[in-house]
Amino acid sequence: MAFRENVLEILEEITETDEVVQNTNIKLFDEGLLDSMATVQLLIEIEERLDITVPVSEFDRDEWATPEMIITQLEALK
């Protein structure tokens, strides 16, 4: 599975909706799909499944607002 699809799969599992796959520009926090607990879960899943460590200091809610933005941020950390 390609990197992009892996990230979207993780997001779909955490948000419990395929809306994140259908609309990769959806505002995850504004729509209530991600909150602080789900964000922690997301970072753990990214580290476990993609072997990418995201330092908490690197997490900026504005830069991680949409699935598309998350993919871009993670590609930069690979």
UniProtKB/Swiss-Prot annotation:
**What does the UniProt PTM comment say about this protein?**
4'-phosphopantetheine is transferred from CoA to a specific serine of apo-DCP.
Quote any Pfam family the record assigns: PP-binding
Where O-(pantetheine 4'-phosphoryl)serine occurs, the residues are S36
Q: What keywords sit in the KW lines?
A: Cell wall biogenesis/degradation, Cytoplasm, Phosphopantetheine, Phosphoprotein
Q: What GO terms fall under cellular component here?
A: cytoplasm
Task: Kindly list the biological process annotations in GO that this record carries.
Answer: cell wall organization; lipoteichoic acid biosynthetic process
Q: Pathway, per Swiss-Prot/TrEMBL? A: Cell wall biogenesis; lipoteichoic acid biosynthesis
Q: Which InterPro entries match?
A: ACP-like_sf, DltC, PP-bd_ACP
Its name, as the record gives it, is D-alanyl carrier protein
Lineage, broadest ranks: Bacteria, Bacillati, Bacillota, Bacilli, Bacillales
